Amino acid sequence: MSPLIDSLFPDQAGRQSRLYVGIVFKALKILIIVLNCSLPSSTTSYSLKNGSAINSHSPIPTMPLITLEEHYVSPAVRDANPATRDLYELFPPHILSKLESLGDERIQDLDKGNVSLQVISHGPGDGSPSACSAANDGLAAAISKNQTRLAGFAILPMNEPSTAAKELERCVKSHGFVGALVDNHLDGKFYDDERFWPVFEKAEELDVAIYIHPTFASEEMMGHYKGNYDDSVAMALSAFGWAWHTETGLHILRLFASGLFDRFPKLKIVIGHMGELLPFQLDRILAQSERWGKRDRGLREVWRNNIWITTSGMFTLPPLACLLQTTSIDHVLYSVDYPFSANEKGLAFIREIEKSGLIAGEDLEKFSYRNAEALLRVKAKAS
């Protein structure tokens, strides 16, 4: 029996494991259909110039593009945990190939979307200290072969926060990583618990960003999403269909309420997916947060100074407009969510933004690459 499926559907342990695999695979197929390789309409023509996919109805871009929420999977992490291995075995072969590639296939896909620099991070999954170190060393080796195109976020063993802080320091100082990407929770435990704070303390000390990324529901969380519908729907609601975003948004509020940002006022936190639903509710949350007890700084100031937001996996104008009305353009960054979304789809979104005028001129440069350069201290070259 799959440990992953047991955790997702513990009250159905008597069913055959192949049924569980079918349920999760069906849900993952929905995710792939929605997010991955949903390329621009066939009415938009493309031509190739210098190996890059170009929309022939728009000017050829001269500015660089940097993406920040772009994934890979290391065998060191995947194969060390049966649940993680089971999860990744459910993905279609072409997605697995892209997740496992840190070489030619990845670079070719960057060219297709005019991506100048991709910041790579591990996909969801817990890792032991040794597995995380091995994964980080492997990523560093791959980056060394394409230093102008690739950068790295570390994977950290969050179950051992002191060790995780040391691994973050090692990766930044020895490998030149630009921060870390961590799962949104550890089996349902959020990082407002002070036992996790050594990681944030170290990130502030090193002046690097922590990217908080959605992950799959714990067994306890999963029960909240089951109902009078198929288990594949429950799976989707607990993950990419809803809870990935609400739970990550909730996490940011928990971190604020716990006093984390008062303890570490220079901390840099990144979240994706247009702000994990927070921008839509921000005014209401700001008003309510004034009743949450005395803070050195209010939520508005924390939002303005400590939170950066990427557009990963989101390619429509209405949520971007909402984000821009609540957040300084200096803290809004382009991303794709590769390989679950295609770089070409991101490029088409850049075209749509240009055409709409929603972001233009110097602000478009900030969104596309300058903000990432400033936050991560990297440099990108135009395609």
Question: Model-derived features: where do they sit?
Answer:
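Mid-to-C-terminal alpha-helical segments outside catalytic/metal-binding sites
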Residues: L4, L8, G51, H57-L117, ...
